[in-house]
Amino acid sequence: MSFYATIILALALSMDAFAVAVCKGATLHKPHFREALRTGFIFGIIEASTPIIGWALGLYTSQYIIQWDHWVAFGLLVILGGRMIYQSLKRGDDCICEEAPQRHGSLSLIATGIATSLDAMAIGVGLAFLQVDIVHTAMTIGMMTMIMATLGMLIGRYIGPVLGKKAEIIGGMVLIAIGFNILFEHLDLFMYAH
């Protein structure tokens, strides 16, 4: 996977965390930079870990589905992208918010980080079938998520839940586009090989 594809994938995967961070930022009385950075750090560490877990699972099963690797990556990306779009549209303009605390609890942030990183784990499964440096890719995903979640917290109270919803929709569309790109690249190479 190219450098630019890795950045685009990381940006797409960080949109879930960004959308949640916007919502979390909107629920805080006044989000401070330290709280935003803490949220970004927690989300980033989790988001960097889950693709590696998924990648390891993918390697374990790769011998059974190597002929369909491009279809697996395509299917996972389309399903996850579609799920992001569906959940965003289903939720509507509502932001799942609480009363305005001064800061969010660590356990709450960890649970939210895990929930938003399940798509990254599934992507990791798909990445096991591609020639990627998983550590570099996971670090890029984690750093992008940290940056986006931190920014989301800081600007959440100003832009509210509407942009958070649009960010999720855009992230879903990008994942679907990457899935089609992987499929078309593989099918194109397959056609030239025969």
Swiss-Prot record:
<dbReference type="GO" id="GO:0005384">
    <property type="term" value="F:manganese ion transmembrane transporter activity"/>
</dbReference>
<comment type="function">
    <text>Probably functions as a manganese efflux pump.</text>
</comment>
<feature type="transmembrane region" description="Helical">
    <location>
        <begin position="40"/>
        <end position="60"/>
    </location>
</feature>
<feature type="transmembrane region" description="Helical">
    <location>
        <begin position="134"/>
        <end position="154"/>
    </location>
</feature>
<dbReference type="InterPro" id="IPR022929">
    <property type="entry name" value="Put_MntP"/>
</dbReference>
<keyword id="KW-0406">Ion transport</keyword>
<keyword id="KW-0997">Cell inner membrane</keyword>
<dbReference type="GO" id="GO:0005886">
    <property type="term" value="C:plasma membrane"/>
</dbReference>
<dbReference type="InterPro" id="IPR003810">
    <property type="entry name" value="Mntp/YtaF"/>
</dbReference>
<dbReference type="Pfam" id="PF02659">
    <property type="entry name" value="Mntp"/>
</dbReference>
<keyword id="KW-1003">Cell membrane</keyword>
<feature type="transmembrane region" description="Helical">
    <location>
        <begin position="3"/>
        <end position="23"/>
    </location>
</feature>
<feature type="transmembrane region" description="Helical">
    <location>
        <begin position="169"/>
        <end position="189"/>
    </location>
</feature>
<keyword id="KW-0813">Transport</keyword>
<protein>
    <recommendedName>
        <fullName>Putative manganese efflux pump MntP</fullName>
    </recommendedName>
</protein>
<comment type="similarity">
    <text>Belongs to the MntP (TC 9.B.29) family.</text>
</comment>
<feature type="transmembrane region" description="Helical">
    <location>
        <begin position="65"/>
        <end position="85"/>
    </location>
</feature>
<keyword id="KW-1133">Transmembrane helix</keyword>
<keyword id="KW-0812">Transmembrane</keyword>
<keyword id="KW-0472">Membrane</keyword>
<keyword id="KW-0464">Manganese</keyword>
<feature type="transmembrane region" description="Helical">
    <location>
        <begin position="109"/>
        <end position="129"/>
    </location>
</feature>
